[in-house]
Structures are given as C-alpha cells and as structure tokens.
Amino acid sequence: MLSFIFKISRFRFWIYTGGTYVVGYALGASVIGDFFRPEYYIYLFYFFFPANIFIYGVNDYWDYETDKLNPKKDEKEYRIHNMERKRLLNVIYLITGISIILMLFQNLTEIIIFSIFLFLSYFYSAYPLRFKTRPFLDFSSNYLYVIPGIFAYYLVTQSIPSTIILIGAYLHISAMHIFSAIPDIEYDRAAGITTTPVFIGKRLSLLLCLIFWIFLSLIVINLANFYPLSFLVFLYPLFPLALLLSGNIKIEKIYWYLPYVNTALGGLLFVALIIDKNILGIL
C-alpha cells in the first residue's frame, strides 16, 4: 500500500507544494524560534506528501480514460490500472479525512486558505468544473501550488503576502502549467481535452510562457534590489526562448529539467531569506 501511495504522489513534484510552503514560511519568519513551532513541521509533512497524494490521486482517478493515450504515464509517472481505482479512491478519502482533522485546529482565515487549496486541487481534475479542460482557467487554477506558500506565510505572520509577490507567483505558476501542457497537446486533443496549448497552439503557448517568465524575472530582480544572484531567475524565460528560436530542441526532453531548476532556485531563495533576515542570529 505504501509503495502504491508513493507512486501516485509523483515524487518529482513534491517540491512544488512542499517547497512553496517552506519558502512562504521563510518569507514570513522573523526569528529562528519560528522554525521550532510544531505546526511548522505538521504542515511541512502535509504539503510535501499528503497534499501531493491528494492532487495527483484525484488527477489519476478522473483522468483514467484520457491517460490511456499518454506515454508519459509509463515513462515518467505511474499509470493507474482499472483494478487499482477503488484503492486509489480510498486513499483520496484518507487524505481528505486528514485534511478535515487539520482544519479543526485552524482559525477562520487559515480554514479559508486551506479550503481554497483543497477546492482547486480537487476541481482542477474533477467534474463538473474540471478546470484543466477550460482554456486560461487551466493555468489560473494552478494557483493551487502557490496556496501552500500563502498558508505558511499566514501561519507565521497572521497576514497575507504583498500583492506584487502574489502576482509574481501567478506569473510563474501559470507559465509552468502552460509549458508542462505543451508536450501533451497531441494526446489532449485526441482525448477531447481543450487545454490552453491545445486552444492557442504550441508557438503562442511558448510565447505566453516567455512573456510570463520575463515579467516574473523583472519582479524578482526588483524585489531583490538588483542583487546579482537574483538574475538567475532569467533561466526560466530561456526555456521557451530556446524552443522558439530552435527547431531542433524537443520540449519533451527539456521540460524534465524544470523541477531541478525550481528546486535549485527555491533552495537559493530560502537560504537568501534566512541570511537577509538574519534569522539564525549569527550576524
């Protein structure tokens, strides 16, 4: 059972919820003691593991038919078999139960933020809303990956991050979603799923990613007061730019480098926040 749960959680993407949570918490933390609060570790575990089980478990359950056409499920992810669907549903119920228990100990604002995360995580794939089949709503609903960071920030500060940070997060997560959906254009179209890349085509999708990531880069550099390392954020627009300028690069290959870039830059941001705030109290 544990092996099954691990497979559906898509460990390559744990960083997308867990990492966001850690960075959001570091952004709000002011003293080293903030990292010794028990609730920090409770939600650290939740957003790294159970949250991913919920997101991708729901996705695998509702995409069972369409996933039959996508070879990615055999190469990089786990393909759910028909006899496993009931077990998968039980796992989703389990994580839902854990989530409800956590909400019993949250204040009203925390419940609202947490509920938004669960709502978007579920209805991104599930009917009747199924945001993933609605152009422009598909990448917008992917803001679910930002919510753990907002929740963490509120957990430690009892306030919401600034608007410019929320906008920058939207630009990044939108570009990430569009970029990840481009390799699936052929399979989504065959399955009758109209994602943004299916709707506007590969080239316009790459251009939209380029625009989003350029604006994200400008926001990050400005917020960092032009600190030299902040210019590493320009790695993101290089991905769609390279594909737009060259016909020899396959997006299916370079897409799988993005989790490494996200992990490296996310880790760098976490360390930078700790140092900048002198949270360790060593300066």
Model-predicted regions and their roles:
Residues M1-L283:
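Multi-pass alpha-helical membrane architecture of UbiA-family
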